């Protein structure tokens, strides 16, 4: 069934796909509400995370994205706000055992995470081990029912058909978003990848653009081509760029 759905999606892509914006524009509030203010650096300190959370509160970002060891701290810093705590699972390689990813996700939610960004098993995807990839994602989704799960497909390592397959499997497995990149690979988000991903998953799922998004113009372009969320460590700079352009 999985293979059939992938083949069907590839055939539709070859016949009907057209690269064009999905919306005409995006304003500063659209950008703010899409940003997941991110610090996944291996040398991030508790003070860095406190600053990240303060900036997210002040700018009314959607959320912060932090490494698992900082979920509790971020939860405390954001208490009483609408800012979501997002963390990562199987990060950054995606090569953990499936049960390890599931347990990581459970521990993260117990610590206060609202959303989980898990890394797909890239090697298994490239080997066309579709059932493995499906179960890998499904196990995380099932382990944290009621929480948002995003699947990082690491587009820089995939060809077009593999990107389509990753999106199809993520959707079948019950994930809520697909995400372009870890930020630790050889490339980040592109408008072309974001648009393709949105075209495949449709309105039933979201798309998170992440990796290399550093300016207001970058963020607007991603949203115009289908991104629902923006993962970036440059959230404040992006907002400042929008305010300089439009006033604020």
Curated annotation (Swiss-Prot):
Protein name: Deoxyribose-phosphate aldolase
Protein's gene: deoC
Catalytic activity of the protein: 2-deoxy-D-ribose 5-phosphate = D-glyceraldehyde 3-phosphate + acetaldehyde
Taxonomic placement: Bacteria, Thermotogati, Thermotogota, Thermotogae, Thermotogales
Pathway(s) annotated for this protein in UniProt: Carbohydrate degradation; 2-deoxy-D-ribose 1-phosphate degradation; D-glyceraldehyde 3-phosphate and acetaldehyde from 2-deoxy-alpha-D-ribose 1-phosphate: step 2/2
GO molecular function, one term: deoxyribose-phosphate aldolase activity
Functional note: Catalyzes a reversible aldol reaction between acetaldehyde and D-glyceraldehyde 3-phosphate to generate 2-deoxy-D-ribose 5-phosphate.
Active site: 117 (proton donor/acceptor), 179 (schiff-base intermediate with acetaldehyde), 208 (proton donor/acceptor)
InterPro entries associated with the record: Aldolase_TIM, DeoC, DeoC/FbaB/LacD_aldolase, DeoC_typeI
Calcium found in the keyword field: no
GO annotation terms (biological process): 2-deoxyribose 1-phosphate catabolic process; carbohydrate catabolic process; deoxyribonucleotide catabolic process
Main location per the UniProt record: cytoplasm
Activity at various pH: Optimum pH is 6.5 for 2-deoxy-D-ribose 5-phosphate cleavage.
Family: Belongs to the DeoC/FbaB aldolase family. DeoC type 1 subfamily.
Root EC class: lyase
A Gene Ontology cellular-component term: cytoplasm
Pfam families membership: DeoC (PF01791)
Subcellular location: Cytoplasm
UniProt-listed Enzyme Commission number(s): 4.1.2.4
Keyword line: Cytoplasm, Lyase, Schiff base
HAMAP family, A to Z: DeoC_type1
């Amino acid at each position: 069934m999985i293979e059939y759905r992938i083949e069907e999606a590839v055939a539709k892509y070859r016949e009907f796909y057209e690269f064009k914006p999905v919306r005409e524009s995006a304003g500063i509030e659209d950008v703010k509400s899409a940003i997941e203010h991110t610090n996944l650096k291996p040398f991030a300190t508790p003070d860095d995370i406190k600053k990240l959370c303060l900036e997210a509160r002040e700018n009314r970002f959607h959320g912060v994205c932090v490494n698992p060891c900082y979920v509790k701290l971020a939860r405390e810093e954001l208490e009483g706000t609408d800012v979501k705590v997002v963390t990562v699972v199987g990060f950054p390689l995606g090569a953990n055992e499936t049960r390890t990813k599931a347990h990581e996700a459970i521990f993260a939610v117990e610590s206060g995470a609202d959303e989980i960004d898990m890394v797909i098993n890239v090697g298994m995807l490239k080997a066309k081990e579709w059932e493995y990839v499906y179960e890998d994602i499904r196990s995380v989704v099932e382990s944290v029912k009621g929480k948002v799960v995003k699947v990082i497909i690491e587009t820089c390592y995939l060809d077009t058909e593999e990107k389509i397959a990753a999106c199809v499997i993520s959707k079948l497995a019950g994930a809520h978003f697909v995400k372009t990149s870890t930020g630790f690979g050889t490339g980040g988000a592109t408008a072309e990848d974001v648009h393709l991903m949105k075209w495949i998953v449709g309105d039933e799922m979201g798309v998170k653009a992440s990796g290399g998004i550093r300016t207001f113009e970058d963020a607007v372009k991603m949203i115009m081509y289908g991104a629902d969320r923006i993962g970036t460590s440059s959230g404040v700079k992006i907002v400042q760029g929008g305010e300089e352009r439009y006033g604020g």
